[in-house]
């Protein structure tokens, strides 16, 4: 009751009707096994929230807790879209041409070639509906552009992506292509994708800090130059700030589900809610389901 009042005290009376508080008595900690915790802690906040989404008492869910628990709750509580064997987390990363979608960025560390194809289809729908990119280009993350490069997973995935008629597959891409914007959608397994995501975030933060240090330690002319480029620096910092993108979409489950960093501040949560609204209003789940059906029919005909 006290927490409920604290939340509502931050809003005026006109806004109070927009807020409904649902109580839960349990929480899933970061060090717990996600699957076991979701099954045993029926009153955990993420489990309660997922039930509300399943029962259509809300249109989308935003979580900034344990990623593993969020994925497990979505799988057990919502279920997968028919034809999707492995949901994927789709994360937008800034590039020279706009935004590149990377998936999977951490839903599951391993993936079969068939799962990668499903990710490519889901990522294409995301890029087309959420980012308004027509006929998005899809690339398979690899150690070289040649079709013969890569490990067993990459070698087995390439021909499947090449044969998939419902995506615009352009071939293998390397890590540097993500920020160059060579393609719009980059497909990889969750282990590699999560490493890429964390590296990109760390690199962006390091670059901004190094630039600030260079200006502060560079003498009068450097400081003068820093003042002149301050507006541009602010714009760059905003573009590289993960909080501006809100959260990542968990694609492949039956309702809009957004996953944020556990360290997300107010701005990130606000933007994640905006992403969730777009996710629901653009019927991304329904479009993914439709494209998966088309893909399966095409493969059956072949």
Show which residues each predicted segment covers:
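Short, small-residue-biased leader/transition segments that mark boundaries at the very start
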Residues: 2-7
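Metallocofactor- and cofactor-centric catalytic cores in central/energy metabolism, strongly enriched
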Residues: 8-10, 20-35, 173, 240, ...
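A short helix-to-beta-strand connector/capping loop
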Residues: 14-20, 165-167, 253-254
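Phosphate/nucleotide-donor binding subsite
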Residues: 15-58
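Short glycine/serine/threonine-rich phosphate/pyrophosphate-binding segments
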Residues: 42-56, 60-74, 85-90, 112-113, ...
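Glycine-rich phosphate/nucleotide-binding loop
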Residues: 75-88, 94-102, 182-186, 190-301
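Glycine-rich phosphate/diphosphate-binding loop of Rossmann-like nucleotide-binding domains
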Residues: 109-175, 184, 189, 201
């Amino acid at each position: 009751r006290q927490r409920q009042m604290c939340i509502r005290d931050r809003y005026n009376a006109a806004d109070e009707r927009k807020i409904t508080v649902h109580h839960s008595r349990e929480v899933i900690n970061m060090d717990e096994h996600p699957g076991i915790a979701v099954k045993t802690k029926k009153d955990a906040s993420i489990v309660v929230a997922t039930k509300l989404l399943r029962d259509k008492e809300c249109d989308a869910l935003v979580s900034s807790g344990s990623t593993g628990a969020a994925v497990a709750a979505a799988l057990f509580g919502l279920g997968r879209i028919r034809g999707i064997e492995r949901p994927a987390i789709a994360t937008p990363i800034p590039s020279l041409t706009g935004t590149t979608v990377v998936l999977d960025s951490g839903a599951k560390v391993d993936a079969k070639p068939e799962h990668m194809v499903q990710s490519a289809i889901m990522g294409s729908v995301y890029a087309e509906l959420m980012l308004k990119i027509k006929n998005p280009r899809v690339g398979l993350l690899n150690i070289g552009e040649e079709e013969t490069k890569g490990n067993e997973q990459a070698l087995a995935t390439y021909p499947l992506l090449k044969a998939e008629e419902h995506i615009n597959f352009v071939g293998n891409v390397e890590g540097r292509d993500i920020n160059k914007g060579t393609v719009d959608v980059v497909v990889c397994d969750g282990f590699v994708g999560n490493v890429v995501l964390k590296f990109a975030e760390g690199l962006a933060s390091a670059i901004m800090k190094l630039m600030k240090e260079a200006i502060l330690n560079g003498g009068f002319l450097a400081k003068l130059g820093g003042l002149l480029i301050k507006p541009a620096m602010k714009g760059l910092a905003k573009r590289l700030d993960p909080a501006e993108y809100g959260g990542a979409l968990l694609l492949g489950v039956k309702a809009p589900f957004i996953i944020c960093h556990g360290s997300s501040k107010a701005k990130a949560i606000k933007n994640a809610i905006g992403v969730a609204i777009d996710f629901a209003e653009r019927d991304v789940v329904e479009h993914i389901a439709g494209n998966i059906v088309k893909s399966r029919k095409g493969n059956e005909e072949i």
